[in-house]
Curated annotation (Swiss-Prot):
Residues 1-36 are annotated as: Disordered. PANTHER family: PEROXYNITRITE ISOMERASE THAP4 (PTHR15854:SF4), THAP4 PROTEIN (PTHR15854). Residues 1-11 have a biased composition (Basic and acidic residues). InterPro entries: Calycin (IPR012674), Nb(III)_bact/plant (IPR022939), Nitrobindin (IPR045165), THAP4-like_heme-bd (IPR014878). A motif (GXWXGXG) lies at residues 64-70. Signal peptide: none annotated. It comes from Saccharopolyspora erythraea (strain ATCC 11635 / DSM 40517 / JCM 4748 / NBRC 13426 / NCIMB 8594 / NRRL 2338). This is Ferric nitrobindin-like protein. Pfam families: THAP4_heme-bd (PF08768). Belongs to the nitrobindin family. It comes from the Bacteria. The lineage of its organism: Bacteria, Bacillati, Actinomycetota, Actinomycetes, Pseudonocardiales. Coiled coil: none annotated.
Amino acid sequence: MTSSDQPERGSGDAAVQAAAERAEQTRGRNVPQFDDLPGVGDTANLRLGPELNQACLALLPLVGVWRGDGEAKHPSLEESYWFRQQVSFAHDGRPFLFYESRAWRLDREGGEVVAPDFREVGWLRPQPDDTIEFLLVHSGGLSEMFFGKPRNQTTWEFGTDAVVRTPSAEDATAASRLYGVVEGALAYVEERATSEHELQPRLSAKLDRVVG
């Protein structure tokens, strides 16, 4: 092994220090709570609220709120563009996670917000055989039913079993998603197929933890 192949001296310590600094900023934050609602509220912070259900342990690294930028690029789009996104994975102690995503279109990479963009809500439902059902509804008129499994402790892969469209929805026939937590950040790639195009990348983003 050459010297260029070896890790930079102290790089491990720097990574640990960076993780500790992130935790100091995010450990006390949570999703908004309404005190006048009955029962247990949602939490995206494993330090606060109800304990994570045992069925959801394979999804534990996802729990939190994540923000960052990504790129939309696909033949079905008029043009590629950059977006800012917030993704939340929360729970209320029951055997599923609640998922919510909001995005805003940017004028350029790393630029300013110019318009609201896509929104998604859904639920991840782990099953006894390690399969994860991912039910996802889009503001653009799509409903998708994904099935997936963990690749390892910090990576999850999903593919659609069914796609339902309203009459006014965008063209879509299938999709896949790959999520991974890498060095404290959440990265994902979505592939999309349409009636005219085979499955290929459409969305990708890298998001930093802001809650949890």
